[in-house]
Amino acid sequence: MLLLLAEYLQQFYKGFGVFQYLTLRGILSVLTALSLSLWLGPWMIRTLQIRQIGQAVRNDGPQSHLSKKGTPTMGGALILTAIAISTLLWADLSNRYVWVVLVVTLLFGAIGWVDDYRKVIEKNSRGLPSRWKYFWQSVFGIGAAVFLYMTAETPIETTLIVPMLKSVEIQLGIFFVVLTYFVIVGSSNAVNLTDGLDGLAIMPTVMVAGALGIFCYLSGNVKFAEYLLIPNVPGAGELIVFCAALVGAGLGFLWFNTYPAQVFMGDVGALALGAALGTIAVIVRQEIVLFIMGGVFVMETLSVMIQVASFKLTGRRVFRMAPIHHHFELKGWPEPRVIVRFWIITVILVLIGLATLKLR
């Protein structure tokens, strides 16, 4: 929006041409989203408290979590508001990738909002029935996948890239839609499963989003892409503005979500942010790198799958409780220790993901 204004004003003063630079708009985007989160956060927390929109807690969970009951939830709406405003202000709104990621994020956020709302109204932790949640996730995920497939301008946009193996490129064809669906929906649910402790999900999300922003910038620049032997996706660089907004909004939310949390993001935030990460990774053809950098999300998801499969097949549980962060809590780890150690793991995995840029 402001880019259009800057382009108009450039005819009167050439200095406005500086807004053409992605790096500047990325910096302004992160600062805008961060400021909005910090500014609106206290107001949103008070509003949620007044309306008694509090977290429902599982009775079979760790006993330490019973004290969290009633903590304001649905704070993810704050993150999405900051992301949307910052992106609309600083991104090039003629770029289709910006709209795809923003729309997918908000649609998955809508699913989470309905889920959270039902939890608040019914005063239990079940929320929206799983079949309906997965149905709408599938509708929106497939819709995004089909759109990206139909609007692909170059073959590389539907090719699977294997990091560290520069000669391995797999033409997916229509299977691109299938892969994209699983990446978007899988990422959405993985982040949601991780969101069980104060600040546990948001910080890894911020770190992965920041790294994906780097991939977006490099992939959108033909010279950098050729030098690093990564896919050149014209227009993908504009997504650095969205990624920066996510980083800023996430850090602003963490100010209130850090232990002991004043507010939880709820499904409205977790489902949306996970879908955003998945969609961005698909666009820049870095699905495998997302799998690496989001290793904490993968670990949380696998722990649930293993736990369910083991119990159904043998009647025994592998972990004391799933997702795995609860397993460590029941082993006696204090909540802050679990959180920070998972953050450290994410830092390492993100660095490994970034290292794939040179390991070719």
Swiss-Prot record:
CDD domains: GT_MraY (cd06852)
Keywords: Cell cycle, Cell division, Cell inner membrane, Cell membrane, Cell shape, Cell wall biogenesis/degradation, Magnesium, Membrane, Metal-binding, Peptidoglycan synthesis, Transferase, Transmembrane, Transmembrane helix
Main location: membrane
E.C. designation(s): 2.7.8.13
UniProt subcellular location: Cell inner membrane
Gene Ontology CC entries for this record: plasma membrane
Pathway the protein contributes to: Cell wall biogenesis; peptidoglycan biosynthesis
TM region(s), chain numbering: 25-45, 73-93, 97-117, 142-162, 167-187, 199-219, 236-256, 263-283, 288-308, 338-358
InterPro entries: Glycosyl_transferase_4, PNAcMuramoyl-5peptid_Trfase, PNAcMuramoyl-5peptid_Trfase_CS
Cofactor: Mg(2+)
GO terms classed as biological process: cell division; cell wall macromolecule biosynthetic process; cell wall organization; peptidoglycan biosynthetic process; regulation of cell shape
Catalyzed reactions: UDP-N-acetyl-alpha-D-muramoyl-L-alanyl-gamma-D-glutamyl-meso-2,6-diaminopimeloyl-D-alanyl-D-alanine + di-trans,octa-cis-undecaprenyl phosphate = di-trans,octa-cis-undecaprenyl diphospho-N-acetyl-alpha-D-muramoyl-L-alanyl-D-glutamyl-meso-2,6-diaminopimeloyl-D-alanyl-D-alanine + UMP
Function: Catalyzes the initial step of the lipid cycle reactions in the biosynthesis of the cell wall peptidoglycan: transfers peptidoglycan precursor phospho-MurNAc-pentapeptide from UDP-MurNAc-pentapeptide onto the lipid carrier undecaprenyl phosphate, yielding undecaprenyl-pyrophosphoryl-MurNAc-pentapeptide, known as lipid I.
UniProt-recorded name of the protein: Phospho-N-acetylmuramoyl-pentapeptide-transferase
Origin species: Pseudomonas aeruginosa (strain ATCC 15692 / DSM 22644 / CIP 104116 / JCM 14847 / LMG 12228 / 1C / PRS 101 / PAO1)
Highest classification ranks of the organism: Bacteria, Pseudomonadati, Pseudomonadota, Gammaproteobacteria, Pseudomonadales
Gene that encodes the chain: mraY
